[in-house]
Amino acid sequence: MANKIRVRYAPSPTGLLHIGNARTALFNYLYARHHGGDFVIRIEDTDRKRHVEDGERSQLENLRWLGMDWDESPETHENYRQSERLELYQRYIDQLLAEGKAYKSYVTEEELAAERERQELAGETPRYINEFIGMSETEKEAYIAEREAAGIIPTVRLAVNESGIYKWTDMVKGDIEFEGSNIGGDWVIQKKDGYPTYNFAVVIDDHDMQISHVIRGDDHIANTPKQLMVYEALGWEAPQFGHMTLIINSETGKKLSKRDTNTLQFIEDYRKKGYMSEAVFNFIALLGWNPGGEEEIFSREQLINLFDENRLSKSPAAFDQKKMDWMSNDYLKNADFESVFALCKPFLEEAGRLTDKAEKLVELYQPQLKSADEIVPLTDLFFADFPELTEAEKEVMAAETVPTVLSAFKEKLVSLSDEEFTRDTIFPQIKAVQKETGIKGKNLFMPIRIAVSGEMHGPELPDTIYLLGKEKSVQHIDNMLAKL
């Protein structure tokens, strides 16, 4: 095994980059960069049935958007896709066959299904039973000849050491061990189509690429003993393994599911909605790891410097969409205006709102944004029909002082000339209404805000009125007075 730390992220090109896979990539990336090691991308594309066109491009594109870079990948190195490494796998299959550590199995899917059904009915744990048990060499040869004559294509199975103990000290969970007798019998390392199974190919790849540490989700724990068997059969040293805990939905407490519609689970979704990649990177980094302390906002460089594998959580990581949005808002409101406007611009353009007021509108709503696509509904006031009031807003407008406030403020606006109507002259007009009527606080400001914008909350009221314009503001107030 290499002395230098070398880790890998090895996705299957079967769809979009999920938040769980993004976390796996990110933790490997942070670990490598913190220790001055190598971060390798390898594509595991041996499951041809689930292969999605453009799946590989999508994975790499979204990793790059998150801000990760890598030292080796299919983009720069040959044979970094499993489909390009079939000769290498075959070489080791042949070696294990020659050494008697693996054998060709001619049992059919129908026979396997029937045996599983028998075992389940008998209350036995399903397992593969070697089809050659009890056969003499002559009987074995006759059986193989008969099966091959019938056109049955064999798989290749690894001969499992039933008395073996397969254990490792996990980077996250500590000591874990499995008994060879609980693995389910001899298992397939090469399918009928000639492709290796995952648990075989991944060992060959990790050894060939000198991977020193394998950091992945704890759904892979059950795969680890099988992989250790292959390392043992080939006489190789295994890497260190670390299995991160599940990601659960913070609302349900259950494993995060693609059916959870209250969460954005694919990195592509965050890109399309105009989240800042730095915010998503920061949020994912804290799913099952934290550096200690109360601080939660970290740059990529800070996260690399702070990353400590000993602080990986042993408890499930809670995915909280509200926290993601809080963090995203923190990034957006503190980002430089040019970056935020660049994120908002495509959404404004698509909505036909890229007017001479566009920059002012983005500046106005920047403190509220959780994602750039929100700029369109937030600016409806300036482009769309006046919104219907909510019950809470109607309750505010039912107060007996509201007509007095609105009429007085309308008069103040009308009295301003076009030159006098500026952002800085609006607040003094509101204060003048307060002085004249004796009405103050939310009884003063809330009716004006609702009458002008149709909302109880929003940006600074003078900013909203100024961007809306004197004429439209007066029109909105007149319309509201007519409804009271």
From Swiss-Prot:
Compartments, as annotated in UniProt: Cytoplasm
Motif annotated as 'KMSKS' region, chain positions: 255-259
InterPro entries to which the protein is assigned, alphabetical: aa-tRNA-synth_I_cd-bd, aa-tRNA-synth_I_codon-bd_sub2, aa-tRNA-synth_I_CS, aa_tRNA-synth_I_cd-bd_sf, Glu-tRNA-ligase_bac/mito, Glu/Gln-tRNA-synth, Glu/Gln-tRNA-synth_Ib_cat-dom, GluQ/Sye
Locus of motif 'HIGH' region: 11-21
GO cellular component, one term: cytosol
Keywords, sorted A to Z: Aminoacyl-tRNA synthetase, ATP-binding, Cytoplasm, Ligase, Nucleotide-binding, Protein biosynthesis
GO terms (BP aspect): glutamyl-tRNA aminoacylation
Catalytic activity: tRNA(Glu) + L-glutamate + ATP = L-glutamyl-tRNA(Glu) + AMP + diphosphate
Predominant cellular place of this UniProt entry's protein: cytoplasm
GO molecular function, one term: glutamate-tRNA ligase activity
EC number of this enzyme: 6.1.1.17
Residues bound to ATP: 258
Superkingdom to which the source organism belongs: Bacteria
Xref: HAMAP family: Glu_tRNA_synth_type1
Function per UniProt: Catalyzes the attachment of glutamate to tRNA(Glu) in a two-step reaction: glutamate is first activated by ATP to form Glu-AMP and then transferred to the acceptor end of tRNA(Glu).
PANTHER family, per database record: GLUTAMATE--TRNA LIGASE (PTHR43311), GLUTAMATE--TRNA LIGASE, MITOCHONDRIAL-RELATED (PTHR43311:SF2)
Protein name (Swiss-Prot/TrEMBL): Glutamate--tRNA ligase
Organism: Streptococcus agalactiae serotype V (strain ATCC BAA-611 / 2603 V/R)
Taxonomic classification: Bacteria, Bacillati, Bacillota, Bacilli, Lactobacillales
Gene: gltX
